[in-house]
């Protein structure tokens, strides 16, 4: 981003930060961890992006005590907190209540619970659940003196999760097409659906571009990708608006991924104060069978 707004100016300049997961460690370790961070010159600590199940262990029942203590421990060492929304990891109880949250792959199979990013950007159930947890976290910590800025979610689209082919996604895709083309004749002309007799009589006839005998219409596929990108932007905007309401003046960022082009980063970043990206010093070398001397160059 070239735009620098007043919120972003608050955190301009190089600062050393770290990701920290207090929920993973015995509380007896937190104070020493924070002291060592300070001694190493760390200024900012990112927390809570994967902690939904600890923040809300049961529907509507929040456990803030541990997170309050973790933030206070970091603040006692003069460390600024980067507070995250925990929406990259919907908990099991939420999936069991609303299985429509799970995304559907291009093979038509539902992608299951058990890792992360197991949600569909177009799921109404997940959109509302995300609003609720963002409201809860932002209202709790929006004015906390240790919270320097915010991060929405975590690495949108990682693990091929931008595009879903669910019924909910198809419904919203049809609405997106109506807004884009106005009437079905305009879509038929733009897509050139006269080819192979693929003309549509209404937007309701249009499905996801998968499962066809041979390759799906390229315009159909392209618009589905554009739609999916807009769904990411819509979802991020919802979170940003909630955070701004409860934490005005504090910068909001998202951690994008390098060389990832599955959605429009500029459109998503347009609602943020800071566009950040995740730097992995070793890249994916730990997953590759390179010789040690090759890895040493990195």
Question: What residue spans do the PLM features occupy?
Answer:
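Short, solvent-exposed turn/loop segments enriched in Gly/Ser/Thr/Pro and often Arg
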Residues: 21-23, 48-51, 84-93, 148-157, ...
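Acidic (Asp/Glu)-rich catalytic clusters
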Residues: 5-11, 34-41, 71-76, 139-145, ...
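Hydrophobic faces of well-ordered beta-strands that scaffold small-molecule active sites
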Residues: 14-18, 45-47, 81-84, 148-152, ...
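Aromatic-lined substrate-binding rim segments of carbohydrate-active enzymes
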Residues: 31-39, 43-112, 134-138, 235-246
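Boundary/entry segment of secreted carbohydrate-active catalytic domains
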Residues: 7-29
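Polysaccharide-binding and catalytic clefts of secreted carbohydrate-active enzymes
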Residues: 107-296
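Alpha-helical scaffolding within the catalytic cores
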Residues: 2-5, 28-35, 66-69, 137, ...
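Low-complexity, Gly/Pro
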Residues: 1, 7-10, 35, 81-83, ...
């Amino acid at each position: 981003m070239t735009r620098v707004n007043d919120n972003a100016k608050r955190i301009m300049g190089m600062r050393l930060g770290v990701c920290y997961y207090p929920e993973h460690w015995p509380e007896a370790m937190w104070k020493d961890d924070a002291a060592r961070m300070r001694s190493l010159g760390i200024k900012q600590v990112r927390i809570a992006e994967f902690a939904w199940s600890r923040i809300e262990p049961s529907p509507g029942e929040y456990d803030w005590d541990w997170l309050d203590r973790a933030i206070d421990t970091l603040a006692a060492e003069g460390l600024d907190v980067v507070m995250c929304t925990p929406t990259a990891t919907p908990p099991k109880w939420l999936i069991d209540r609303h299985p429509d949250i799970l995304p559907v792959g291009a093979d038509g199979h539902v992608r299951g619970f058990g890792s992360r990013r197991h949600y569909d950007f177009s799921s109404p159930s997940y959109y509302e659940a995300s609003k609720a947890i963002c409201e809860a976290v932002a209202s709790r910590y929006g004015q906390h003196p240790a919270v320097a800025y915010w991060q929405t979610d975590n690495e949108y689209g990682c693990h091929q999760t931008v595009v879903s082919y669910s019924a909910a996604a198809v419904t919203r895709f049809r609405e997106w097409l109506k807004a884009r083309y106005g009437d079905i004749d305009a879509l038929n002309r733009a897509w050139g659906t006269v080819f192979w007799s693929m003309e549509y009589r209404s937007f309701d006839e249009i499905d996801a571009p998968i499962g066809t005998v041979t390759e799906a219409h390229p315009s159909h596929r392209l618009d589905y990708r554009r739609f999916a990108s807009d769904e990411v932007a819509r979802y991020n905007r919802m979170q940003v608006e909630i955070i701004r309401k409860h934490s005005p003046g504090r910068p909001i960022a998202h951690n994008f991924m390098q060389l990832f082009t599955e959605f429009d980063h500029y459109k998503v970043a347009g609602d943020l104060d800071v566009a950040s990206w995740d730097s992995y010093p070793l890249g994916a070398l730990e997953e590759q069978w390179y010789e040690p001397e090759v890895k040493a160059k990195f």
